[in-house]
From Swiss-Prot:
The keyword Membrane applies. Keywords: Cell membrane, Lipoprotein, Membrane, Palmitate, Signal. Residues 33-53 are annotated as: Disordered. This is Uncharacterized lipoprotein SCO6871. A lipid is attached at C28 (N-palmitoyl cysteine).
């Protein structure tokens, strides 16, 4: 569910702030080609491969997405949403629906329609080999006249041959990556994994992001990434969690099984790559000793049903974007967007006995 309101909410809640730890007795470009980035002659391919689609077709895909996404969001219609979203983005959007359904009607925000501004959209359409799954990336804005600050990936799903958005990342800057374009304005797709021409691949980037959350970047995070706003924010989430409950509880991050291993990479003008990937992590809040409880917040109601817990494990699915150099230098995490997709934990024993 890719409304700007919901995406803005997703960007920040990696450290859940809605729970309350308390004592048990208290309450709590043109149509013929994209040509929106600086052309780079070195990005040309030989022999020339066909682009994934034309710029006009890509704009039609974006327009269709906005239209159907609005219709689905208004009715919390998962089936309709499934016709324009897939992969990690669909899982994140469905969790938004679930959260909304857990709220009383009076607490639900009225839905506001939106659309992407095609006039400011910057298309990164790669040339692809015959038989290669088709995809493209786009820098988008949901406000007319405002520079794009969101990177989206659209892929043609083989099972039904339609284009769907699979990933979206809110960037920390409106300065977009310098994607290399050939003379006709098309990008060059490069392998996102096992690419010996890059300083890091998607698997290593994912490991580094998880380390930022889990250890504050001690093991791999600060070695792989330069200190950008995005990586600093992840490290701050970790450090804030360490002192969040004082001596009354703990908050710990860890990696989790990741169903979404697809990654997408485009060559950049400096010979490196823009890599778009996803990861999954957990945050487990727990009381330090008996006599304490965690009271779920209203946004957790769909999963936790207002039942006090001794611990809660939240699951987050996130989309990430990084620029990677061709030589052995740190990569730059330029944005990430997350959504809580599950929450669970053992109820307070006294509550279980009453039930």
């Amino acid at each position: 569910m890719e409304s700007p309101i919901r995406t803005a909410r997703r960007t920040l809640p990696l450290l859940i702030g809605a729970t309350c730890l308390v004592l048990a007795l208290t309450g709590c470009a043109g149509e013929d080609g994209p040509a929106q980035a600086r052309p780079t002659p070195s990005a040309s391919t030989s022999p020339k491969q066909a682009p994934a689609l034309s710029a006009a077709q890509a704009r039609d895909v974006i327009t269709r997405y906005s239209k159907i996404n609005n219709e689905a969001n208004a009715d919390l219609d998962r089936r309709q949403l499934d016709t324009v979203e897939d992969g990690p983005l669909y899982a994140m959007s469905v969790s938004d629906y679930t959260e909304t359904e857990g709220l009383p009607a009076k607490d639900r925000e009225p839905y506001k329609r939106w659309s992407y501004d095609l006039a400011s959209a910057k298309l990164y359409i790669p040339r692809l080999a015959a038989g290669q799954e088709r995809w493209f990336a786009a820098a988008l804005s949901s406000e007319k006249g405002k520079a794009p600050s969101r990177l989206a990936v659209f892929a043609e799903l083989p099972r039904h041959k339609r284009w769907e958005m699979v990933s979206v990342v809110d960037l920390d800057s409106q300065k977009l990556p310098d994607v290399a374009l050939d003379r006709e304005g098309y990008a060059t797709a490069v392998p996102a994994n096992d690419n010996k021409h890059l300083a890091a691949d998607a698997n290593l980037l994912r490991t580094a992001v998880l380390d930022n959350f889990a250890t504050g970047g001690t093991n791999t995070g600060t070695k792989v990434f330069a200190p950008t706003k995005a990586s600093k924010r992840q490290i701050k989430v970790h450090s804030d969690a360490a002192t969040r409950f004082g001596d009354k509880g703990t908050s710990v991050f860890d990696g989790a099984d990741n169903r979404f291993t697809d990654a997408y990479a485009l060559k950049t003008a400096d010979g490196g790559a823009l890599i778009l990937f996803s990861h999954t992590h957990t945050q487990t809040d727990a009381v330090a000793h008996s006599g304490l409880q965690i009271n779920p917040g209203k946004d957790d109601r769909a999963w936790l049903h207002d039942v006090p817990r001794t611990s809660i494990t939240y699951t987050f699915i996130c989309n990430d974007a990084a620029t990677v150099p061709a030589k052995s230098q740190p990569s730059r995490l330029i944005g990430y967007t997350c959504a809580r997709t599950n929450a669970s934990g053992p109820p307070l024993p006294s509550w279980t006995a009453r039930a």
